Amino acid sequence: SEIIRFFVLFSFDIVLIPNAFTPNGDGINDSFYIQRISLYPQNTLQIFTRQGQLIYQANGYKNQWQGIGTDGMKVPQGFYYYILTLKKAKETKEGWLYINY
């Protein structure tokens, strides 16, 4: 008889980035919450409008963004582009997110 072995690898250090959040003050999903971002304290997050205007930037992001732009006002409902750079992983993640109030 033959023995077959399977190995399953789990990675618990992968950040999970949502594609939407609702910063409406109800206490649910009010910030752009990136799971496991605390494993990468040396990170940079940039958020842009669809036209390419930078509206938010943080070095050492800690899930604090609640849809407030650089002007101190709530950004309009809609799609935004993010760039998250993780120094430790030497990786950049990019994508779209939707803000809904």
Where are these regions (language model features)?
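Short loop/turn motifs at secondary-structure boundaries
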Residues: 5-101
